[in-house]
Amino acid sequence: VRLARVAAAGEVFWALLAPDLRHLQRIREPFSVWAPALGQAGKACLGLDDEFLALSACRLLPPLEPGARAFGVGLNYRSHLERLGSAAPAHPLAYLKPDSALVGADDEIAYPAMTEQLDYEVELVAVLARPLGDEPRAASCVLGYTVGNDISARDAGRRIARLDLLTQKAMDRTTPVGPWIVTPEELGVEGQPELDMRLKVNGQLRQQDNSREMIFPVDELLNYLDARISLRPGDLVFTGSTHGVGLEDGRFLMPGDRVEAHIDGLGTLGNRIGPRRVLSPARERGRLGRPAGE
C-alpha cells in the first residue's frame, strides 16, 4: 500500500492512496495503532473512511508523524566517495535533522542566506513502523520507504575550517521528502529493496544509481542508529546519496531551479528552489563564525 500525510479542508491526517494514485481515503486510527500492525493485519487496521477524496484537493506533507525524528547518513555510496577521492568510512556518518528542515512534494525549497553552494542528493528513506526488537533483520521493523532529497550547503564551515553539519544539513525548509510511503509488501520485497534512483535539475540528469550499491545497508544503518538513539515508530532514516552531486563538478543549485528526485516504485519528488533568503544586518557578529586567528 501507499500511505500519505496530507492537509485538506483545514485538517492534517494520514491517508491511504487508491491504486489509481488520484484518490485517497482518510485513516482514522492513530499512527501508533496502525503503523506497527499494518504488516500483519493489512488495511483492516487503518479504520478507513468510506469517502474517497481527490488527491488534487489535498496538499502532500512530509510523511513524518508528529514527535518522530529524521536521521541522516552521509558517505554511504562508494561511487560518490571515489569521485571525491575519499576512502569508505569504518562506520556510518549520521546526524539528526529537525522537522523544520523538512518540506513535502511540490513545496518550495528555501535557499538559505548562509550558503552559495546549495547541492542536491537523491536518497532512499526508510520509515520505522515499530521499535527495533530481537529480529535478525532490523529492516523488518520498517513501515515502508519514501524518496528524500538531502539538500546540502556545501560551503558550510569553510570559514571556520571545520565540519558544520548544523548549517550543512539542518537549515529551515531545505529537505524535501515524499511524496508518500510505499510498504515493502507493495514493493514485493523483504528487507532492503534494490531500486533504481535518479535526480534531474531542470530536466537534466545529474544522478543515477541503485540502492543496492550502499556501503552500509538498511539493516546496519538501523542497528547503528538504534545503539545510540532508540528508534521510534515514524522515524525517518535517510540512507545516503550516490555520485553526481554538485560538490563533484561545481554545478550547484540556483534560485528558480526545478529539482526532481525519483526512485522506481516509490515515485517522484519535485520541488523548485526559492529566492535566496536575505538576513537583517542586525546581530551579524557570530553568524558566520570567526576566521582562524581572530
Spans of model-derived segments:
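Residue-level "contact hotspot" at macromolecular interaction interfaces
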Residues: 63, 117-119, 230, 252
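Short beta-strand segments
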Residues: 7, 72-73, 96-97, 119-129, ...
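Structural signature of FAD isoalloxazine-binding scaffolds in flavoprotein oxidoreductases
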Residues: 88-105, 120, 255-265
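N-terminal non-catalytic cap/leader segment that marks the start of a structured domain
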Residues: 1-92, 258-260, 279-282, 286-294
